[in-house]
Design a protein with these regions (language model features):
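Catalytic core and acceptor-binding pocket of nucleotide-sugar-dependent glycosyltransferases
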Residues: 72-79, 92-174
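Active-site-proximal specificity loops/subdomain of glycosyltransferases
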Residues: 2-37
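Catalytic metal- and UDP-sugar-binding loop of GT-A-like glycosyltransferases, i.e.
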Residues: 48
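Short, surface-exposed amphipathic charged segments that create phosphate/polyanion-binding patches used
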Residues: 14-25, 86-90, 160-166
């Protein structure tokens, strides 16, 4: 089912809790409040950015077993220096937040919204992608990495396979 949710009350409450720059609108943080916005009987949710193009059946994605994870997503290319800067650490995956499968039961158990707010207010000024960075840092020990087919980002399409392997294995992109 496709459900539209009015998040205006949530956004108004966030304004008093989250300090953010004008560069990122408050609405970017709404997905951090999914457990508050959605009824308790919803156990899992598939989040997709509005610019996502679906080319095939997504049932396999929906049926991914995430019972032991907070979130599932596809790896994003992020250099190790940036991962360390945001407090993630080199050994942890960094996933793209454009397509995410959230385990709402696990997130409710750990009061995830408070962790999100605390991190944004403490370290948010060093984040390039605040909502994506927060998801990666807070959930770093409970991320399931999904196959790339579930979220192919455009920079992957401009490379030959050999070039992409070099790009992915680089420790310095600049």
């Amino acid at each position: 089912n496709l459900i539209f949710i009015d998040a205006s009350n949530c956004i108004n409450r966030m304004r008093g809790k989250i300090r953010t720059s004008n560069e990122w609108p408050m609405v970017a943080f709404v997905r951090l409040y999914l457990t508050e916005l959605l009824p308790n009987d919803i156990e899992k949710i598939l989040y997709m950015d509005c610019d996502t193009i679906i080319c095939d059946d997504i049932c396999d994605l929906w049926n991914e077993d995430i019972t032991e994870y907070n979130v599932a997503g596809v790896l994003d290319c992020m250099d190790d220096n940036y991962k360390e800067k945001i407090g993630l650490g080199i050994g942890h995956p960094y996933i793209n937040s454009g397509v995410l499968l959230f385990n709402l039961n696990k997130l409710r158990d750990i009061n995830i919204e408070k962790e999100f707010v605390d991190l944004v207010n403490k370290r948010g000024s060093c984040f390039k992608y605040p909502d994506q960075d927060v998801i990666n840092v807070v959930m770093r020990d409970s991320i399931k990495v999904l196959p790339m087919k579930y979220n192919v980002v455009s920079q992957c399409l401009g490379f030959k396979y050999e070039e992409y392997v070099i790009y992915r294995n680089s420790s310095n992109y600049y």
